[in-house]
Amino acid sequence: MQIFHNLNEWIRFRNSLSPDLSLGFAPTMGNLHAGHASLFLASSKENHYTVSSLFVNPTQFNNPDDYKHYPRTVDADLELMTQNGVDFCILPNENEIYTDGYAYQVQENRLGQLMEGKHRPGHFNGVLTIVMKLFNLVKPTCAYFGEKDYQQLLLIQGMVKALFMDIEIKSCPTVREKSGLACSSRNNRLTPSQREIADEFAKIFHQNKSSAMISKELEALGITVEYIEEFQGRRFAAVKIGDIRLIDNYLL
């Protein structure tokens, strides 16, 4: 796997590649897990080359403490990429990415105001802006995103369509732990007792009951429910276990 620490080096290399070659792209913020690995493997099966990126994007954190405490596990992340078919990895720094000081932003004013957008103001502006920048740098044929962040997936699909970007967005199923808990970088921050509660969250959330009944059961376990909502035939949830925020969704 080739690693690019400098964006100008990457741009020169990207421009040297034949336009006949397909590039799959799976952007990440690091602290990788089995869900990320599934994106890399899907891309490597369908493209000549697979590209990933490691960049903890400050503009999508509405809570500065979350950004500060986001785990940086670069060596382990690069190893996981190497083992799962990534050919090129870009590791840009913040000054390279935000040469404009975040003066220019991508904003969506409908879906981006619901659920995650309502509870995390500015989050999706940061997500869409960084994804747009990375798309322009990588120029992928296809880009791969997990269904765990389904609202994000819909917004990226919408952005690509609205802005006439010649990129195919591929969705990959949520990868879950044995308990049914969705794989997430945040799971690593759970204490053993919180992990047990998180496993119960996954089981209760997937019950064939009303959102109100599910909320009541979760709250009885001491879980803070931010929202449980149904949208476009899926059920979405965001909860807090202690100070760890978890999200999930599934097709009804």
From Swiss-Prot:
Name of this protein: Pantothenate synthetase
One GO term (biological process): pantothenate biosynthetic process
Binding site for (R)-pantoate: 60, 152
SUPFAM superfamilies: Nucleotidylyl transferase (SSF52374)
Pathway named in the protein's UniProt entry: Cofactor biosynthesis; (R)-pantothenate biosynthesis; (R)-pantothenate from (R)-pantoate and beta-alanine: step 1/1
Catalytic activity: (R)-pantoate + beta-alanine + ATP = (R)-pantothenate + AMP + diphosphate + H(+)
Provenance organism: Legionella pneumophila (strain Paris)
Active site residues per record: 36
Keyword annotations of the record: ATP-binding, Cytoplasm, Ligase, Nucleotide-binding, Pantothenate biosynthesis
Domain of life, source organism: Bacteria
Described purpose of this protein according to its UniProt entry: Catalyzes the condensation of pantoate with beta-alanine in an ATP-dependent reaction via a pantoyl-adenylate intermediate.
Single GO cellular component term: cytosol
